[in-house]
């Protein structure tokens, strides 16, 4: 855990997401008046829902206690994950404790093959927790859940213009007639 110099007087509450310019750092564990305690994602007691960026593959990212290593266990044993894939937060209801779509890290190794009981990937965090200086706390999650943007759009019918009838040479052309005044 680390302490930050913002607390309840600054609007912080328990279970808010903590980030920096590189990605996810952790979550607010406990808030005091002018400070807060943050549990880091690398902490062995830490876990967060994760998703392979650009796909629907989800799993649990857990801290290992090492500053440069996380464990990502896929929920689907047939799921596809490979070295070089980015892992982002899946998100929590109401954005707490984790807002969705935040960068977590890059897959560096995968154990187990598709179809085995479990597939575990080793993830190198984007954030170097040993070099933290300025952090941000997500006080209000995004209005629209970014993970929804990875879902395919519902198919929509493309309107086709209706054909316009044109008179052919064999058809008679109609002419407008104006009624003549009656002598009546």
Model-derived segments and spans:
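A secondary-structure micro-motif
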Residues: 1-184
């Amino acid at each position: 855990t680390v302490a930050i110099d913002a607390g309840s007087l600054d609007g912080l509450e328990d279970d808010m997401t903590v980030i920096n310019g590189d990605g996810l750092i952790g979550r607010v564990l406990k808030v005091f008046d002018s400070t807060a305690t943050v549990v880091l994602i690398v902490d062995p007691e830490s876990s967060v829902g994760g998703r392979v960026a650009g796909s629907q593959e989800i799993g649990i990212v857990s801290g290992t206690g090492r500053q440069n290593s996380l464990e990502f266990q896929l929920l689907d044993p047939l799921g596809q994950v490979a070295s070089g894939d980015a892992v982002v937060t899946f998100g929590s209801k109401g954005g707490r404790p984790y807002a969705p779509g935040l960068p977590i890290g890059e897959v560096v190794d995968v154990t187990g093959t598709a179809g085995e009981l479990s597939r575990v990937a080793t993830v190198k965090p984007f954030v170097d927790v040993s070099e933290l200086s300025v952090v941000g706390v997500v006080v209000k999650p995004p209005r629209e859940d970014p993970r929804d943007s990875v879902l395919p759009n519902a198919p929509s019918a493309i309107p086709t213009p209706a054909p316009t009838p044109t008179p052919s040479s064999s058809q008679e052309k109609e002419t407008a007639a104006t009624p003549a005044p009656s002598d009546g």
